[in-house]
Amino acid sequence: MKNRIVFLDYLRVIACLMVMVVHACEPFYLNDEGTFFASRWNALWATWIDSAVRACVPLFVMASAYLLFPVTQPTGAFFRRRLVRVALPFALWTCIYTARFDGDWGKLLFNFPADIIGGHLWFVPMLLGLYLLMPLLSPWAEKASEKEVRGWLAVWAFTTVFPYLRGLWGHLYGAPSFGAVPYLYGECPWNAFGTFQYVSGFFGYMLLGFWFRKFAGEISWSRTLAVAAPLWGVGYLAVAVPFLLRIPDAAGYPVAAPYATAVSLETSWEFCSAGVALTVVAYFLVIRKLTADGAFYRRVIRPLAEASYGTYLMHMLVLAEVCDLLKPRLTAPLAIGATALVSFVVASLLSMALRRIPRVGHWLCG
């Protein structure tokens, strides 16, 4: 217990449950044909609830950075540990999802199985990409001053408004003359790597986790809430309002549209957008105050946290079945909450049970 960072266990559990909530919301604005809102009621609840938990993935990234960055061990040893604990379970579950849902095995040579119930696996390749970056940036991080880190965080913060800038372009000038989306600052069909490519995206959350570890001092609960509450409020509005206002419901409900409509609606929900980033900081500020390590922590939180990677990897196998059972029987908010909670409990118990199997358990669940 002495070397364990207790609040990160609380964070893993909370973020993992948030992921379940995000995926429990999806059937209320998506179906097999594309975008679908059955009613205004469903649209409102899906928006209100999902917008509150978009911080889930960035919180996982910050937890990894808080623990691992800067890297203090030899690069080879660092990569070998990540290979066994992260990449191997990902590879095995990728195969499990592909087999379970009759996916195309050939596509696995190019990407994770995004076209079946396995889209949530995108998180792991992204995280592995950050792991590739960590040893490269560690010498700089060890020597960087707080002012320098804040400067880079400011640059990254500017990139979090890009989703809104793309929308502004569309509002001012209409559809781009070439390409699927408006390009910004050096991006074009023959160059996907614009000016801010290397200081944008989840890199910022990695840097933010490092900043909290090295430079953020302890503050009281009252001050924490005084800072976190307005950050969360502003961020939540920036996430929820654009989604809700852009639902194409002029002709009434139900609303049926191509899948691309949902992708467009989710612009303000993007994990690296400004609104989500504000809620991430707010959540992290509050969660790092959770340091109680008594019986509840030892018997509930820590086991759930240790099993959380396996829970994440397998949860869609459980959630899809639970959703099919509960969605027709409950109203939207109850169905979302119950689906998320039941899926979290079942997947966590399965992950904890699998982890008890010698060797194989860690291959599957990290």
Regions found by a protein language model. Give the residues of each.
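Alpha-helical transmembrane segments and their immediate juxtamembrane cytosolic regions
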Residues: M1-G366
